[in-house]
Each structure stands twice: as structure tokens, then as C-alpha cells.
UniProtKB/Swiss-Prot annotation:
Role of this protein: Catalyzes the NADPH-dependent reduction of glutamyl-tRNA(Glu) to glutamate 1-semialdehyde (GSA).
Miscellaneous comment text of the record: During catalysis, the active site Cys acts as a nucleophile attacking the alpha-carbonyl group of tRNA-bound glutamate with the formation of a thioester intermediate between enzyme and glutamate, and the concomitant release of tRNA(Glu). The thioester intermediate is finally reduced by direct hydride transfer from NADPH, to form the product GSA.
Organism per entry: Pseudomonas syringae pv. syringae (strain B728a)
Gene3D superfamilies documented for this protein: Glutamyl-tRNA reductase, N-terminal domain, NAD(P)-binding Rossmann-like Domain
SUBUNIT field: Homodimer.
Gene: hemA
Domain of life: Bacteria
GO biological process terms, semicolon-separated: protoporphyrinogen IX biosynthetic process from glutamate
Protein name: Glutamyl-tRNA reductase
Stored Pfam families: GlutR_dimer (PF00745), GlutR_N (PF05201), Shikimate_DH (PF01488)
Reaction(s) catalysed by this chain's protein: (S)-4-amino-5-oxopentanoate + tRNA(Glu) + NADP(+) = L-glutamyl-tRNA(Glu) + NADPH + H(+)
Site (Important for activity): H97
Residues annotated to bind NADP(+): G187, A188, G189, E190, T191, I192
Length: 425
């Protein structure tokens, strides 16, 4: 049995590649089914966020190259282009990687908590698609437990930092007084919710939430005293917006150069600060060419993020140790499970032989045989039957020169150096 974790992330691939390899929520079930068909496995999950796209697979039949080829073909990339950015982890390394990801140790923002929720969503989607079996199910549960322990036992979650926090921190650097600024937030997901919370806590003058559905926008707006509008209202809202932060799941840009250019004219070229957190991007890159626009992508947030990480570096060392212990413990328990079927079959065979010898002894007693003689024969018969198959196999292994197997058998039967001593009289 083999586990495989492969994919790309913010450290190995540019935003251009990441947005091309991202899965939409609507694609996930179909992609999972294709993946399981390819690997001849019933167990697979896909984690796709703005910073990473990863496949988690239990497999026996295919190597990583075949799965990478499927991923490249699915997203219409050349295999060479994908391979240049991809990483592959197997078995113990795959388990450790998943636990590091869920704990926020592999995130753009060290220790950020959102990734655990995204990992749980990936697990839920895979379960709904019927592609999580007992092995991958155990791995996800162990991963969640490890991430929880990291949060509980280390300070990695203190001094909150995230992509959302980094975006707001950058806005603070550009606008000295956020209380006089107006913000337009595009989207209504988890990241935008965090952005809204940070801006609200900083006392931003006015917040507008634009979303595909007014109902979802209104729910988020109500939480922070903001205003809700539809995506179609964005051009009008741009005129009054000093800060624009966008994070949707749209496959096409929502905000283009023309709309921003028109808004700037009406604003008399008062600057607009924009952060596009989405992958694929919500804001056309050409918008950044405008003189009075400060446009940042996810990749541009690295420097801001670095300033907020210093307090977490020490905690990360302790977290890495917890993850290593968790991964080792999981693999140890998994290997123990591999012996369960063998032990069950051996026990059933032993019980069958016991019952045969016991029935024979009971018949002898019923026929008047001496009880002591019956017990001796029962013990001798049971011993001979239990040792017959192992004896035959050991002689065969010895004839074949399998010294390693003989040494393993000695360990299996706990035959120490003193095992040949005569029993006490």
C-alpha cells in the first residue's frame, strides 16, 4: 500500500502556473473520479487553494509520472511545464507533508489557520464523491489531530497573520489613516471575511461587499456594518473606493483596465490600492499599468508576510517536532494494521486445529481412556499440528539458503540464545 502527495504551491510555481492548475469547486467530483479510475484506486482527494493544488492518493499501480501526466492533461499544460514546478512525496514523506500543510507549516503565511479548514473541505468533498476509503480516511483524521495538537501545544497561532492580514497591513502602509478610507471587497468567502474583520477592527470609514449573489454579500455585510452590492455594481462603487481587495472563485477576470480607468477619471486620479488574492486572478494584470493604481497579487505579499512571521519562527521548530512524531506514529499504526489479516487467519487456523484435537480427546475420554494419557496425547497432537506448516516452510527456506528469513523466523518465534536449554526437571 502506498500514499502519494503531489502538486504545486506558492514556493514552486508562479501565480500564472497556479491559476492554470487550480480546480474549481464544480470540477472536483469529476476530477476525483477520473483520478481514481486512472490509479485503479478508490481513494483520492484534491486540495486546491490560491496557493496550492495538491493530490492525495492511495495507490499501488501507478507511479507519480502517470499522475502528473493526467494533471497536466486535465489542465491543458505541457507535462514538462508542470514537472518543472511539481513536487512528489511518497509514503512516510507524504504523511508528513499533509500534516505540515494542515498545520500551516508549509503556508505562505507560517501558521495561518485557514489551510486546516480548506483541508477539511477537501476531505468532505472527497467523501461526498465516494473517493475516501479506510486508509485515506485514517490519514486525514490523523492529519487533523496533528494540526490540532500543533495549535494547542505551540504558539504558532499567536499574533495572527494571514494573506488577508498581510493585505490589510499593506493598506495601512499606504494609507496613514484608514478611518478616512473606503474599501470595496469583492467576494464573500473565508478570505474576504477575514479582510472585512481586520478592516472593521481598524475602523475603516466605509466597507462595501460585492458578490455574485446579493444574499451572501448581505450576510457578510451585516456582520461588519458594511454595504452589500452585486458584481455588476462594481464600476459605480470603484469611484468611491480607496481600497479594493478581491478574492473570488471566478475563472475570468472581474475587474478590467477600462473600468478602473473610468473610475480614476471620476476620482480625479486619486490613488486606488488594490490587492488581488484570487487564483485565477480577479483583476486584469494590465490594471497595474495605470499611474494611480497600486496593484498587488498574492505573490507580492511575501515581504509583508515576512515582517509578521518573526514571532512564529521559534514555535515552528516545536511544531515540526510534533508533526514528525505524528507522522511516525501514524505509519507505525498503519504497518501494525497490515498484520491484522495475517494474525486473524493464523488464529482461525490455530483454533480449528485446537478444536480437532479437543474433539479427539473428548472421544477418547468417553471411551474410557486414561485421563493423563489423553492429556499428554492432546498436548503432543496440538503441538505437532501447530508446528507442521512452519517446520515445512523453514526446511524449504533453509534449503534455498534464505538466511535472512531464518533469522526473521527466530525473531518471530522469540527464540533467544537460551531457547535450546533443557527445561527444568
Amino acid at each position: 500500500m502506498a500514499f502519494l502527495a503531489l502538486g504545486i504551491n506558492h514556493k514552486t510555481a508562479s501565480v500564472d502556473v497556479r491559476e492554470r492548475v487550480a480546480f474549481t469547486p464544480e470540477q472536483l467530483v469529476e476530477a476525483l473520479q477520473q483520478l481514481c479510475q486512472l490509479t485503479q484506486s478508490r481513494e483520492a482527494a484534491i486540495l486546491s487553494t490560491c496557493n496550492r493544488s495538491e493530490l492525495y492518493i492511495e495507490h499501488e499501480h501507478l507511479g507519480a509520472d502517470s499522475i502528473l501526466a493526467w494533471l497536466a492533461n486535465y489542465h491543458h499544460l505541457s507535462l514538462e511545464e508542470l514537472r518543472a514546478s511539481a513536487y512528489v512525496h511518497e509514503d512516510d514523506a507524504a504523511v508528513r507533508h499533509m500534516m505540515r500543510v494542515a498545520s500551516g507549516l508549509d503556508s505562505l503565511v507560517l501558521g495561518e489557520p485557514q489551510i486546516l479548514g480548506q483541508m477539511k473541505s477537501a476531505y468532505a468533498v472527497a467523501r461526498e464523491a465516494g473517493t475516501v476509503g479506510p486508509l485515506l480516511g485514517r490519514l486525514f483524521q490523523a492529519t487533523f489531530s496533528a494540526a490540532k495538537q500543533v495549535r494547542t501545544d505551540t504558539a504558532i497561532g499567536e499574533n495572527p497573520v494571514s494573506v488577508a492580514f498581510a493585505a490589510v497591513s499593506l493598506a495601512k502602509q499606504i494609507f496613514s489613516d484608514l478611518q478616512r478610507s473606503q474599501a470595496l471587497l469583492i467576494g464573500a468567502g473565508e478570505t474576504i471575511t477575514l479582510v472585512a474583520r481586520h478592516l472593521h477592527d481598524l475602523g475603516v470609514k466605509r466597507i462595501v461587499v460585492a458578490n455574485r449573489t446579493l444574499e451572501r454579500a448581505s450576510m457578510l455585510a451585516a456582520e461588519f456594518g458594511a454595504h452589500a452590492v452585486l458584481l455588476s455594481d462594481i464600476p459605480a462603487e470603484l469611484v468611491n473606493s480607496d481600497i479594493v481587495i478581491s478574492s473570488t472563485a471566478s475563472q475570468l477576470p472581474i475587474l478590467g483596465k477600462g473600468a478602473v480607468e473610468s473610475a480614476l477619471k471620476l476620482r480625479k486620479h486619486k490613488p486606488i490600492f488594490m490587492v488581488d488574492i484570487a487564483v485565477p486572478r480577479d483583476i486584469e494584470p494590465e490594471v497595474g499599468e495605470l499611474d494611480d493604481v497600486y496593484l498587488y497579487s498574492v505573490d507580492d505579499l511575501h515581504e509583508v508576510v515576512a515582517e509578521n512571521l518573526k514571532s512564529r519562527q521559534g514555535a515552528a521548530l516545536a511544531a515540526e517536532q510534533l508533526v514528525s512524531v505524528g507522522a511516525e506514529d501514524f505509519m507505525s499504526r498503519l504497518r501494525e494494521l497490515a498484520a491484522v489479516d495475517v494474525l486473524r487467519a493464523y488464529r482461525q487456523q490455530s483454533e480449528r486445529l485446537r478444536d480437532e484435537e479437543l474433539s479427539k480427546a473428548q472421544r477418547m475420554l468417553a471411551n474410557g481412556s486414561n485421563a493423563e494419557d489423553v492429556l499428554i496425547q492432546l498436548a503432543r497432537g496440538l503441538t505437532n499440528k501447530l508446528l507442521h506448516a512452519p517446520s515445512v516452510q523453514l526446511k524449504k527456506l533453509s534449503a534455498e539458503g534464505r538466511v535472512d528469513a531464518l533469522a526473521m523466523a527466530q525473531e518471530l518465534f522469540a527464540l533467544g540464545e537460551g531457547s535450546t536449554d533443557k527445561p527444568p526437571q
